[in-house]
Amino acid sequence: MMEFKIEQIAICPMDPDRAKKLLKEMGAVDWVEDHVVATGEVFGIKVTNEANLSFNYDLFGGKEFEILDYTEGNNWLGQNMLTHGKNCVSHLGMHCTSEELISWRKFFEERDIAVAQEVLTDSHTNPVIAGKRSYNYVIFDTRYILGVDLKFIVRINKE
């Protein structure tokens, strides 16, 4: 049986720098930064988008807490921001294999829950990742049911 495990919580604040400053003042001192370029689809429309990602591993018991700041291109939050505004919890995420993702796709399809955004990352600036791996991100449009979207993250190691 499939089981969703929250491994990542992401927020999309109006002012990412101010949000990070406040979180640092609250004890989240160490951040890992990455600028990502990705291509794929947002609600079925082909896109390329860019985002600044900031990760902290202290706030959430060693799991990922992410500040998401889209800088270029269309993204699924742009659609949701029309009704929900920019300050939001972006998603709850889980890492999985490509095989597990196939099962999750079927699970959500059977419940008429659409893919909000699916992208493959083209580039990363984080030296731990850059040139070594990419990701397939699939975000399901569960915001109207759960109040937040669900993201499945597949690591793709480069050989």
Residue ranges and their predicted role:
Residues L23-M26, D69-W76:
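Short, composition-biased local secondary-structure segments
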Residues D30-W31, N75-W76, I145-L150:
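Short loop/beta submotifs within extracellular cysteine-rich repeat domains
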Residues M1-N49:
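Long, hydrophobic N-terminal alpha-helical segment
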Residues M2, I6-M14, S54-D69, Q79-E100, R105-E159:
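Vicinal oxygen chelate
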Residues V32-E50, G73-L82, T121-N136:
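A cross-kingdom feature marking solvent-exposed beta-strand/loop segments within repeated
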Residues V36, L68-E72, T97:
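Histidine- and/or cysteine-centered catalytic micro-motif in compact active-site loops
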Residues P16-H35, L82-N87, T97-D122:
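Extended intrinsically disordered, low-complexity coil regions enriched in Ser, Thr, Gly, Ala
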